Amino acid sequence: DAWNKSGGISVTSSTDEFEFKYGRFTVGSDIAGTTTGRNICTVAGNKGIDVTGDDQYSKGPYVTASFRVRSDLNVRARIRFERYNSEGYTFLCDAYLSLQTHELQITGGNAQLLTANFEIDPGSGWIYFQATLKCLPEWGMVGTQLQIAADRAVGSFATGDWIEVTTPQFEYGACATSFIITTTEPATRASDLCKFPLMKNMYTMPFTFMVEVHKNWFISHNAAPRVIDSENHQSGGPFIMGFGSSGTISQDGYSYCDIGGANRRVYESCGVRDLVMGFRVKADGMTCSFANKHISTETKTVWKYIREAAVIRIGGQTTTGLRHLNGHIKNLRFWNRALSDTQLKEYV
């Protein structure tokens, strides 16, 4: 209920069928005809996220703002970012979403560093709107404003314009974390990690792994989010499948495998959130990676056999959360043979 909203907007609170408490923000007559966006929920730059410290390198130089919105009108939701340092406050960039036409617009002097996306829940009508900003250390502190903006075609507010908002979040990293309803304080959830032994499931070449993956992010939130990763393998014999990171947003999040030094990448998977992906190792050691019908070139692995103590970790690398996927995995399949190229071309 404690929204730090702008003046000229009234708010009423309700709870939806999923137990999300939300606010309806309605434009009053005293600001009708104005063009400036109005705050719903804000974190000022001087109270925001420090993008200069060690966390910048462990979590990546990103901050993410997100919330769920809906309206019967074509008003826009706006996510605005600002910086704060010794020079004071400076506007960085905006992400706009029109709530009926679903037009997405990114503006501002640092627009090239901003990525935004949205998802619509057809059952509830809620639109999940998220924006991720790649930060520069000289910015100091970064804050955000979650706002209502006027219909782009009209250009100004009308009395009675409204937007409903729930689950506002602002956090370090390149994706929003899970939101959990509690009876005490809000909490987030670390991604899950499970293991299974490689021994008795496979031994030597040939073999093929295939799995369905849904990512909760568009920009890599760590150096290399893992789908699977091996533990206790012999020297030079790791099993790795996941996503690579890049300083260039258009090349970030490519899928890859690394099997005994055979590192194969599929750049066509950059920016895709739902994939059927995997890797294949032929009897002669020739290894490829594949994702959504795209197959990489092959190179030869030095891997030869399974060590008895080796296990496969699903969803991350360590129990501390290092290189966790932050996504969903299903239908993990393994064959003790090399599937054909045609068989590798499943896709979501």
PLM features per residue range, with description:
Residues 1-274, 279-290, 294, 302-347:
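Extracellular and organelle-lumenal recognition/adhesion modules and their flexible linkers in secreted
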